[in-house]
């Protein structure tokens, strides 16, 4: 890793590859008395994948319908009846006020 970094730095500074090779050839030899520690054992953790949800229609994803939508749809009406909802009053005509007999 250090050699790669040194190569990148040397290339950026414009040094020739011969000068770089001469610098790397003079590295000190490692002594035999040093002991290397065993590399730490790496543990690989497996990711738990969630089960994919069932595919739905695009409209169902965007618009969550309430329980009211499950009820039976009303009968279709004419276009005019949809626009002009008239309130029907089932009141009988008002009775005239009772006049006291004089």
Swiss-Prot record:
Subcellular compartments: Periplasm
Signal recorded as keyword: yes
Signal peptide coordinates: 1-21
Propeptide: 22-58
Region ranges (Disordered): 26-102
UniProt KW keywords: Periplasm, Signal
Ranges of compositional bias, category Low complexity: 26-41, 91-102
PTM per Swiss-Prot/TrEMBL: Proteolytic processing gives rise to the active protein.
GO cellular component, one term: periplasmic space
Composition-biased stretches (Basic residues): 80-90
NCBIfam families registered for this protein in UniProt: acid_shock_Asr
Family per similarity comment: Belongs to the Asr family.
Function as written in the Swiss-Prot or TrEMBL entry: Required for growth and/or survival at acidic conditions.
Protein name: Acid shock protein
The species this protein was found in: Escherichia coli O81 (strain ED1a)
């Amino acid at each position: 890793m250090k050699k790669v970094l040194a190569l990148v730095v040397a290339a950026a500074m414009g040094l020739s590859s011969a000068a770089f090779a001469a610098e790397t050839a003079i590295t000190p030899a490692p002594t035999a008395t040093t002991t290397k520690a065993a590399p730490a054992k790496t543990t690989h953790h497996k990711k738990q994948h969630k089960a994919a949800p069932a595919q739905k229609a695009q409209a169902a994803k965007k618009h969550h319908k309430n329980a009211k939508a499950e009820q039976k749809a009303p009968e279709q009406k004419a276009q005019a009846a949809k626009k002009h909802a008239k309130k029907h009053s089932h009141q009988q005509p008002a009775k005239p006020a009772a006049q006291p007999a004089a």
